[in-house]
Amino acid sequence: MRKLILFILTTALTLPGFGQAIDRFNPDTIKTIELDSNVKITARKFGIETFINAIVTDETFYQAFRNMKKYTFTAENRIYTYDKKNQVEGKIYRKIRHNNDGPYKMEYLAKEDAGKLFKKNGKYQLYTVEMFDYIFMNPYNSDLLTEGPMTTGAKGKGANEGYKDKLKTLIFSPGRPIKGLPFIGDKTQIFTANMRQYYDYSYDSGVYLDSIPVYRFKVAIKKDISSGTKDDLMIKSLVTIFDKRNFAILGRYVDMKYSNMLFDFDVQMNIEMTYFGEEKLPTKITYQGNWDYPFKKEERASFLIVHKDYHLGKGK
């Protein structure tokens, strides 16, 4: 149970211009968006419902990750683990060339480890780091990026396939319910009529990567509701970046925090994308998170993933 919930929240992905809620070292110093003003959208067929519908129906984020398999690119991966005082305890750095010019090859250009990272048996101390390594170190082999339509954990599938569907829903389609996720599956469904009463909605206008005009649509818990109600809402804020020219989603940030008698977590995640030719591809993924589970070592970690130098693999 612990691994199921931790795996899902570790991998639920996730924009600068948002301060991190956890007060400690932040590896992400890359600023990609400049906001200029609040926006009032007055068109009759364009407003909050337009943004919400785009968020809950979008599958282009998922497709963008799958499209990586056609490209050669360089990935720089940085992982940091922390002690109880939020001082850096361990560091991992990988610079990897994902070479898709011919049969796929993963080439390490740099590989550095420092601090407390491994158990005596050679495995990572933290499950967070283990999951990072499984999913992002080699995205070509990740089970999350299989072909086929998105689902929410349909009946009739094997345990592993249903589990992957849950992960995909939380990562790529926030706002949808996640069937079969213990304790928190219904708390992701923030756009129902009942849940909307607890959230405020705001729009901003800005420029992304110095040239792309964007809207920033933010959903955040209302300030005037009771502390007990706030504590029971898992998603504290959800921010989505839309390209004004075609309404494509280029970025997504989610802040989640929840506590009960079985587990306690505080997680902020971010995913950003940009265009390479006509293709939308991932360029930055960040994570800051604390996990506490009875009788287990508390997990504190952050990571920064940067993808660059994409080019279409030969013959793809």
Predicted ranges, named:
Residues 2, 11-16, 130-133, 211-215:
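Solvent-exposed, well-ordered amphipathic alpha-helical segments
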Residues 15, 19, 61, 262-263, ...:
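Alpha-helix boundary/interfacial micro-motifs
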Residues 188-194, 203, 212-315:
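Gly/Pro-enriched, hydrophobic low-complexity segments
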Residues 21-213, 221-228, 299-316:
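Structured extracytoplasmic
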Residues 17, 44, 252:
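Surface loops and adjacent helix of pleckstrin homology
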